[in-house]
Amino acid sequence: MIQTSRRHFEELVADALDSIPPELTDYMDNVVITLAEDPPEPGLLGLYEGVPLTERGDSYSGVLPDRILIYWKEILAICDTAEDVVEEVRITVIHEIAHHFGIDDDRLHELGWS
């Protein structure tokens, strides 16, 4: 297990977001990404809570932002090196953003992002 501060982990998440092309991030709408401590089930690295873009209708307005939760301690627990942490953060952030865009777990698995 790797040790790092929450602040450093936040920087890794920011770096992962910066690696996503603006052509995609420009379409992210009403979503916040935050670090969380304890996942609802062991081994869960990230969680998207909200209404995917593909399911939003004309009446979608005045709602609280969707949330992407990154369970930082779970990620640290499965990684052996600092490089593993960077890669797992990137994969987890992209995976959860894909859910925001309406891509389900089966399709992510087909694409190699599960």
Q: Where do the language-model regions lie?
A:
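Active-site rim/adjacent substrate-binding subdomains
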Residues: 1-88, 100, 104-109
